[in-house]
């Protein structure tokens, strides 16, 4: 297949691209920095890959490369783990909403349109709660990230009017050793100073990065996948259980909680995502034949950390 990707140099994309290339697909990466893409994916090792510079929120010549592609994978968006100033919140919103709108605009202009578009979203769609359990049919929340996700998904759904199959993944907290939440939590645990963030009672709806990549890979060719799917493992845990399990796998204690105020100073409004959380279940995925490689947390952490 000829596949165009955004967000290819991010935490998920860095593992997705090698898999797709190994399968023999022709990959076009839309990136802000071609040099960064070439450092990550050396031309000698990735002969069927090309990187094209683009500004995600603006129309431009880059849109022409969408013509003739078989699939579009849209994972771009500013990281939400930075401190949320008002200016940065605008970047979080625009990079997702406008970035997706410009991709759909490019598809609309294409003479030969892709068969499928796979677009990221997040479980932040549901807002946060310590008591509710969310599935794909649950109503959206009303906080900032819920607003972002709704706008992001609404932009993606426009592609369906063009006859393109759309798969939206509401992605949970992605676990992998070299990035994301786990990489930030490992150092204090290894120094015997790990512990739960905040009260520890908040839900932590996670997914192993390998399972997320497998879901994206399946969505490329399985025409029965259509619509919205929660990309989370079937066994979410509370933060205190996550930290206890991480300590067990590392043979380290989980005894030193990080107080709310420290996270609020570090992340500002974004601390709410860590301190409140949500319990999200992959109801739609459970009705497919997809099999999780890491359905439970300890299995995932042991595979990731090699213990």
UniProtKB/Swiss-Prot annotation:
Kindly give the CDD domains that the UniProt entry links to this protein.
Answer: SDR_a8
- Provenance organism: Synechocystis sp. (strain ATCC 27184 / PCC 6803 / Kazusa)
Q: What is this protein called?
A: Epimerase family protein slr1223
Q: Which InterPro entries match?
A: DUF1731 (IPR013549), Epimerase_deHydtase (IPR001509), NAD(P)-bd_dom_sf (IPR036291), SDR39U1 (IPR010099)
Tell me the protein family, please: Belongs to the NAD(P)-dependent epimerase/dehydratase family. SDR39U1 subfamily.
Q: Which domain of life is it from?
A: Bacteria
A Pfam family this protein belongs to?
Epimerase
């Amino acid at each position: 297949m000829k596949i165009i990707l955004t967000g290819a140099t991010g935490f998920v994309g860095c593992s997705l691209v090698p898999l797709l290339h190994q399968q023999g697909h022709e990959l076009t990466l839309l990136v802000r920095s071609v040099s960064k893409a070439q450092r990550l994916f050396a031309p000698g090792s990735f002969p069927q890959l090309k990187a094209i510079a683009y500004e995600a929120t603006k129309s431009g010549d880059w849109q022409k490369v969408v013509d003739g592609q078989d699939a579009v994978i849209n994972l771009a968006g500013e990281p939400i783990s930075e401190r949320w100033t008002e200016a940065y919140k605008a970047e979080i919103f625009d990079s997702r909403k406008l970035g997706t709108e410009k991709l759909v605009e490019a598809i609309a202009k294409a003479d030969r349109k892709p068969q499928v578009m796979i677009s990221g979203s997040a479980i932040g769609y549901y807002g946060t709660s310590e008591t509710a359990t969310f599935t794909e049919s649950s109503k959206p929340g009303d906080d900032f990230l819920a607003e972002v996700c709704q706008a992001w998904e609404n932009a993606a759904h426009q592609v369906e009017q063009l006859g393109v199959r759309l798969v939206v993944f509401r992605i949970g907290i992605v676990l992998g050793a070299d990035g994301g939440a786990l990489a930030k939590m490992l150092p204090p645990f290894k120094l015997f100073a790990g512990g739960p963030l905040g009260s520890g009672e908040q839900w932590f709806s996670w997914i192993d990065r390998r399972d997320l990549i497998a879901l994206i890979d399946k969505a490329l060719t399985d025409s029965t996948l259509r619509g919205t799917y929660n990309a989370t493992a079937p066994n979410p845990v509370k933060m205190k259980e996550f930290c206890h399990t991480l300590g067990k796998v590392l043979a380290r204690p989980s005894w030193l909680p990080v107080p709310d105020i420290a996270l609020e100073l570090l992340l500002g409004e974004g601390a709410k995502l860590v301190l409140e959380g949500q319990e999200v279940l992959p109801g739609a995925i459970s009705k497919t034949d997809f099999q999780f490689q890491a359905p439970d947390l300890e299995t995932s952490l042991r595979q990731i950390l090699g213990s």
